[in-house]
From Swiss-Prot:
Pathway where this protein functions: Amino-acid biosynthesis; L-tryptophan biosynthesis; L-tryptophan from chorismate: step 4/5
Cross-referenced PROSITE patterns: IGPS
Domain of life from the UniProt record: Bacteria
EC number of this enzyme: 4.1.1.48
Pfam families for the chain: IGPS
Organism: Prochlorococcus marinus (strain MIT 9515)
GO-annotated molecular function: indole-3-glycerol-phosphate synthase activity; phosphoribosylanthranilate isomerase activity
Top-level class of the enzyme under EC nomenclature: lyase
UniProt keywords, alphabetically: Amino-acid biosynthesis, Aromatic amino acid biosynthesis, Decarboxylase, Lyase, Tryptophan biosynthesis
Any single GO BP term: L-tryptophan biosynthetic process
Upper lineage: Bacteria, Bacillati, Cyanobacteriota, Cyanophyceae, Synechococcales
Family note: Belongs to the TrpC family.
Protein name, entry field: Indole-3-glycerol phosphate synthase
Length: 295
């Protein structure tokens, strides 16, 4: 899937004045492209408040990061669970009205989650880096900053806000971007979960021999519909490669019951990312235990 970056608006000069005119391809083709295009604006606004240089100055005072992959592999629950804190989504709107991130984090940790994923996108998911920072103060579990990362600035902001890991989405990043952003994360001691949505993206990521955490997203990011067959079909072809190269495969989205979890474990999935399934429940701990009681 190809996601374009926002084309710059051309300018027209009339005598001594210049006017920006809409680019003829300045309309996003799908939700993911719309989100990525807005990120450019969001990052510029962030930099007006806190510069990259100011973020870097804060690094020395931070504690060491926690090992995201190790936490998944050592989980008593199989597969290891990346439990997500998410208030809303573009396709479903507000998912959890009574949204108390710290209490949600407590519930996840008590239930046996390996790690916690925190949505930091504000415009489309009603998340924030402030929420990430609050959750960091509420739990000792490794934290994943779940955002649409296109800039090194976001990685520094995630680290300063308490994240131990970041998400990189293969569909929105060039090869050069992936290499560069992975290097930045490595230098900050952060883990990288790289996300793929189809076999073509997976082949591309495997060819780099760079990532040891690969998330197979069962959600079509053009339509935001989910289908567990995405994970099943990719694991049927590539589980041996994952094992050979010590890659930890994570199945993301669309996981709803114990039978699906058993199936994922049987095909070699080591971790699952579950968010909406828990966010819709009043009693998260009860829902968590019910989902994993027979695994």
């Amino acid at each position: 899937m190809e996601i374009r970056r926002r084309p710059p608006n051309p300018t027209v000069r009339v005598e001594n004045l210049e006017y920006a005119v809409p680019h003829r391809e300045a309309k996003a083709k799908n939700i993911l492209e719309e989100i990525v295009w807005y990120k450019d604006i969001e990052i510029k606004n962030f930099k007006k408040i806190v510069s990259l240089e100011d973020l870097i100055k804060k690094l020395d005072k931070l504690p060491p990061t926690k090992d995201f992959g190790k936490s998944i592999l050592q989980s008593k629950i199989k597969p290891g669970v990346i439990a997500e804190i998410k208030k809303a989504s573009p396709s479903k709107g507000v998912i959890r009205e009574d949204f108390r991130p710290n209490e949600i984090a407590f519930s996840y940790e008590r239930s046996g989650a390996s790690c916690i994923s925190v949505l930091t996108d504000k415009r489309f998911f009603q998340g924030s880096y402030e929420i990430l920072q609050d959750v960091r103060g509420a739990t000792n579990l490794p934290l994943l900053c779940k955002d649409f990362i296109i800039s090194a600035y976001q990685i520094y902001k995630a680290r300063v806000s308490g994240a131990d890991a970041i998400l990189l989405i293969a569909a929105i990043l060039s090869d050069d971007d992936l290499f560069y952003l992975k290097k930045i994360a490595d230098n900050l001691g952060m883990s990288v979960l790289v996300e793929v949505h189809d076999e073509q993206e997976l082949k591309r990521i495997l060819s780099f021999k760079l990532f040891d955490l690969i998330g197979i997203n069962n959600r079509d990011l053009k339509t935001f519909k989910t289908d567990l067959k995405t994970s099943i079909e990719m694991m049927s072809k590539y589980s041996d490669i994952f094992s050979k190269h010590n890659i930890i495969p994570i199945s993301e989205s669309g996981i709803n019951n114990s039978e699906e979890l058993k199936k994922l474990v049987s095909i070699g999935i080591k971790g699952v990312l579950i968010g909406e399934r828990f966010m819709r429940e009043c009693d998260i701990e009860h829902s968590f235990k019910k989902l994993f009681k027979s695994i």
